[in-house]
Amino acid sequence: MGKTMAEKILSRASGEDAEAGDIVVANIDVAMVHDITGPITVQRLEEMGVERVWDPSKIVVLFDHQVPADSVEAAENHKIMREFVEEQGIEHFYDVREGVCHQVLPEKGHVRPGDVIVGADSHTCTHGALGAFATGIGSTDMAAVFATGKLWFRVPETYRVEITGELPEGVYAKDVVLKVTGEIGADGATYMAIEYHGEVVREMSVSDRMCLCNMAIEMGAKTGMVPPDEKTLEYVKKRAGTEGRPVEPDPDARYEAELTLDVSDLEPQVAKPFSPDNVVPVGEVEGIAIDQVFIGSCTNGRYEDLKVAAEVLEGEEVHDDVRLIVIPASREVYHRTLKDGVLEVLHEAGALICPPNCGPCLGGHMGVLAEGERCVATSNRNFPGRMGHRESEVYLASPATAAASAIEGEITDPRPYL
């Protein structure tokens, strides 16, 4: 019997002939913490009596959740991590200016096909878009990784998702992954690796594939993965200077479950409160009044996302009753959209453009919702209280749908604007 991508990568990293269900101890290629999970990791290391990390060149420390510091506590956490970085000689440290971890890691060449990547953040699964086995872990497990460079895994079963057909105009990767999430359900792929296949995926940019893999965790999955191809290798070689160790699933690999989705007639999708799998076509929620629109996050804060939003908003104005918050996912994205006029279009339409950060997505700052308020967001979660008050509501959508909704002051089909 052949192997899936997850089985192949964990076999290589553990030195064993690993199959789904096996328990293995794998060598870690990259370990990442941010400003919220990092201080807890440091505390656990101290409790374990560990004085030196296993390899300062394989650890990435990054600030993105509370940047600029939104409280004294956040500032103290930043200070703790800056001191830890200096003390341990951590080679890859990105302070408050660089952006959201799941955008910065691939940009800076820390994601390579075939790697085992762990991050103390649940959306680490994003990096499977480049052919890595990438998954989120807790701060205590991360402390063990910092100390030993190893971590145990139960090798996951794999859910094969094939996307066929051709995307209609006004329908994007976010609409596809929302539809997939609605089909599989919030716990339909629990602890599995989701492998994405099909001509639609092959036509997608690396950024769009990252959007697909980012929401694997919203289906309960351990990770999302896309088999590496020429686009992958071109991106990685440019960023990391190497093609990594790309693997593809064998033709006779065993899959726990399979889904084939023809997107030829797919409409823009929206996830209603209070779960990412509560997905309907935009027409079913069109006309619901909103107070805020958030375009950004590790799901949809990339260049292509902001460019689409600008295409919708060009020559238009944000509705008087709506706050449009735009947050590029990284300094690189910010710079590119600034240079080519995308941010100018968004600014002229009435958007509030913020520095790269995770703030509103986790209900931290730069866009927290009050009781009874509604937001259309391009992020990945809409649980009660996710973006602020527990009685607020979040509707998940593509950047195009979000931008059109900002113009109308209500949830809106973006296709007439394109």
From Swiss-Prot:
Keywords: 4Fe-4S, Amino-acid biosynthesis, Branched-chain amino acid biosynthesis, Iron, Iron-sulfur, Leucine biosynthesis, Lyase, Metal-binding. It comes from the Archaea. One of its GO terms (molecular function) is 3-isopropylmalate dehydratase activity. Its cofactor is [4Fe-4S] cluster. One of its GO terms (biological process) is L-leucine biosynthetic process. CDD domains: IPMI. Catalyzes the isomerization between 2-isopropylmalate and 3-isopropylmalate, via the formation of 2-isopropylmaleate. Heterodimer of LeuC and LeuD. This is 3-isopropylmalate dehydratase large subunit 1. It comes from Methanopyrus kandleri (strain AV19 / DSM 6324 / JCM 9639 / NBRC 100938).
